[in-house]
């Protein structure tokens, strides 16, 4: 793969998100689409909890460019369809969520799963199968505790499997802790991060800015394989 010069590292607080990652035992690298902070306004103060990075399979740029090349970063940022095309795109994604402060696994997954259920209900994809998948999802986190710097990895396949891995740092574990085969849930995880009601507007902005550059570079160098 020829690496576009615009694929660079991103720093979110004290967290470093490298431009490329290769999971253990794999020959496939994923490039950093964007990264940003997730936080909440608590008593008029923005409290930062997590840094989120979205990595994608290399063919994602050319896949998305067919529809989105020529758009400005602002146009991409304002287009929900752009983010939905990332979420539903026919390429693998690896999401890294690293903690900026200590979070209890049960409390963390309670909020994440509530957001996922709310989205699936709003688009009519929440049924008995998704309810079972949410239960699996919650169970995977029940014995976890996340100190600062620790990480949850979500690996998403185009077929709908969601792999979960936990690490005490940014290292990708060799083996996944759990694999859940449910496409609506897998898509909902990323939807809640960068979709219509995102937990990380900063991540959305990073994706728009960086993909605008990726598309420009692809247009200038159409022989780049992404």
UniProtKB/Swiss-Prot annotation:
Keyword Ribonucleoprotein tagged: no
Keywords of this entry: Flavonoid biosynthesis, Isomerase
EC number annotated for this UniProt entry: 5.5.1.6
Site (Important for catalytic activity): 108
GO biological process: flavonoid biosynthetic process
Enzyme class: isomerase
Gene3D superfamilies: 1.10.890.20, 3.50.70.10
UniProt-listed SUPFAM superfamilies: Chalcone isomerase (SSF54626)
Recorded catalytic activity of this chain's protein: a chalcone = a flavanone
Binding site for substrate: 50, 115, 192
GO molecular function: chalcone isomerase activity
Pathway in which the depicted protein is active: Secondary metabolite biosynthesis; flavonoid biosynthesis
UniProt similarity note: Belongs to the chalcone isomerase family.
Remaining remarks: Part of the biosynthetic pathway for all classes of flavonoids, a large class of secondary plant metabolites, many of which are brightly colored.
Purpose of the protein: Catalyzes the intramolecular cyclization of bicyclic chalcones into tricyclic (S)-flavanones. Responsible for the isomerization of 4,2',4',6'-tetrahydroxychalcone (also termed chalcone) into naringenin.
UniProt-recorded name of the protein: Chalcone--flavanone isomerase 1B-1
